[in-house]
Amino acid sequence: MANTLVQDDSVEWMDLGDGIQRKVMAYDAGMMIVKVAFEKGSIGTLHKHPHTQASYVSKGIFDITIDGKTERLNAGDVYFVPSDKIHGAVCIEKGELVDVFAPMREDFV
């Protein structure tokens, strides 16, 4: 799916349950960009993966935990997760994250 131009409405949301949906927007072997929509109160449980992750809060308010430290982030804020660091998110106000992974998440396709 290494399309160079992707229109938002051309990609379907995948329902992950518990008020969370995901759209894999584009990827190649080296990188992937994903939108994740959260309902208020939804929890992205603590987890880790070998991929480096950078995330942009495009909408809403989230409590983001990385390596045991939690901070509240608002629309326009960014966070970075190094490889294999435990992290997660709690949606305080309905919102959306734009996640970039390097390399791509093979488990998402």
Language model region names:
Residues 43-44, 63, 79, 83-88:
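Histidine-centered metal-chelating micro-motifs
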Residues 58-59, 74, 93:
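A cytosolic small-molecule/anion-sensing beta-strand core signal
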Residues 51-62, 67:
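Glycine- and acidic-residue-biased ligand/ion/polar-headgroup-sensing regions
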Residues 69-83:
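Short acidic-glycine-tyrosine-enriched beta hairpin
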Residues 83-107:
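Ligand-binding loop in jelly-roll beta-barrel domains
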Residues 61-63, 70, 86, 96:
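Structural motif
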Residues 34-48:
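Conserved short histidine dyad/triad with adjacent acidic residue
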Residues 1-30:
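A short, N-terminal "cap"/entry segment at the start of jelly-roll beta-barrel domains
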